[in-house]
Amino acid sequence: MLEKFSDSLYKCSFSRKNLVLLLLFFCVAAHAQLKTNESEVGLGWSNNSVNTVIFRNSALTTFKNWQFTAYYNPEGKIVLAKRNLNSNQWEKIITPYSGNVKDAHNCISIAVDADSFLHVSWDQHDTRLRYAKSKMPLGLELGEEQSMTGNDESKVTYPEFHNLPNGKLLFCYRSGASGRGNMIVKSYDVKTRKWTSLQNNLINGENQRSAYWQICVGKKGIYVSWVWRESWDVSTNHDICYAFSADGGQTWEKSTAEKYSLPITKATAEIAWKVPEKSSLINQTSMTVDAQGNPYIAGYWNDNGVPQYKVVYLDKGKWNKIDTDFHTKPFVLGGGGTKRIPISRPEILTNKSMLYLLFRDEERGNKITLGSTNLGKKQWKFTDVTEYSVGQWEPNLDKELWNDKLELHIFSQNVSQADGEGLAEEEPQTVRVIEIKKLPNN
């Protein structure tokens, strides 16, 4: 009897050891799919999310093997930094410029033009345009602040740069206040080194509402999607709309190739996906395009009890939706100001048959997480990129590097965000760039 008991105990112990080893193996194997490299840039302001809001466009950009980034330091000064992609060492400069970091809308947007000059815009929330560019090619030292065209530059919010395949640079922003703003688009020509107005009112809120958009540049043109907001209250967000330009932003059309009469209004906008008000529909997320030029729009809203990430995409002329359903705790989006939300807005990428979502979720410990699915299977897998919390971080990635080399570099900082534009009391946190060496491909 004792021998049988000892033998059973040994077998049980052996099985448990094997199970532990097996689990460890699978954990290591899963982690091996996401080998990362981290480089530290410097200490940044972290009492709110101004350094990491998703609508920076861009926080990180690469031009000819030189990667640039920008952030506010603990004193609210703009820090510009660059490195060679083969190095973890960053060259930094504290500029003479600063911003009102107490408002998380006042983010920094950067781009490098085709002549290798750095362009920077910052510190704007229904305030005057703030813009400067580097004195030298690939330089970090900025010249004097300047206007672009002088028109529609007194009430600027959400500045963002976009590089076009033809070498021109786009600058987009909202002119006017929340709930009654219009979309402005300007174009920079490297030959003349001058800005011109491309669209003085691409999307018109008709003084009744605002469009909150995201932009993607693909080989075939410029893609824009947006939600409408009927007031300052985020709960009035509704509908996901769409437009495309094949000529650098001069003319726009629907997915059916029907030409828009500009400006686009609520009555004329193509609705890619109908979402009613009070659905906790988030604004200003991300979009991408596949090799065939089909757009993919990421977001989240509540259509079944709990807000979940979703992807709306175009395939063979028809709009489709992919759901996720891993978030378990309900929450409601409502009110104004920068919100403290349990999940970040998502960033989306696609490569061949694979679709990727980059996000943060309190239920996963506020770590940076990568979701992946094969479009043929539509089964999601989730892997944490970091082993530590990044607080109220939202994803910003190097889109130029991704488009050129399919390499994923992420701007990262552990930040806080009190609800409604409040401030936390946090020690300055390190700004990092995280490189994912190999993405899941099945």
Name the predicted role of every residue range.
Residues Q33-N442:
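Extracellular, repeat-based ectodomains that mediate carbohydrate processing or recognition
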Residues Y10, L22-L23:
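A periodicity- and composition-biased signal for non-globular, repetitive helical segments
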